[in-house]
């Protein structure tokens, strides 16, 4: 697989505006099947970082990631109400890909867009929440790094 989305890092090219690529989309869609679920860091109520795996993480649009949180009472949802800044890490050694996404999260109310997030989530995640009792979270991506170098950033 070509590493086109890391062009800026490998070539020394300029940082570009956030535009989540086809390669990023494919990597995140296959992450759970490949045993490399996305790790998400958020800030707990005491101000400390905490981390969790989110196998439902996927590209929602060119500037947004989405997560389906199966448990509507999950601590993650409570944390992002207080502080919506997140970091999400994707690492796949076999693909030789690493992406660190930084952004801000918002919880969607139930409705059409929330249903879209559920339907676009990994089938295994849907099977664990067949009643769709969870909540959809959108992450506006502000910065993408790969191998320690910023490759995409919003103005």
Locations of the language-model features?
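Binding-site signature for planar aromatic cofactors or substrates
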Residues: 2-155
């Amino acid at each position: 697989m070509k590493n086109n989305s890391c062009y800026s890092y490998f070539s020394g090219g300029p940082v570009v505006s956030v535009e989540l690529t086809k390669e990023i989309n494919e990597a995140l869609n296959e992450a759970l099947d490949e045993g490399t679920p996305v790790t998400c860091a958020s800030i707990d109520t005491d101000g400390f970082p905490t981390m969790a795996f989110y196998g439902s993480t996927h590209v929602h649009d060119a500037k947004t990631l989405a997560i389906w949180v199966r448990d509507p009472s999950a601590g993650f949802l409570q944390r992002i109400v207080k502080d919506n800044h997140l970091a999400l890490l994707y690492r796949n050694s076999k693909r030789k890909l690493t992406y660190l996404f930084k952004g801000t999260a918002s919880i969607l109310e139930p409705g059409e867009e929330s249903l879209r997030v559920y339907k676009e989530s990994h089938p295994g995640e849907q099977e664990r929440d067949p009643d769709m009792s969870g909540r959809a979270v959108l992450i506006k991506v502000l910065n993408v790094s790969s191998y320690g170098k910023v490759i995409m950033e919003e103005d």
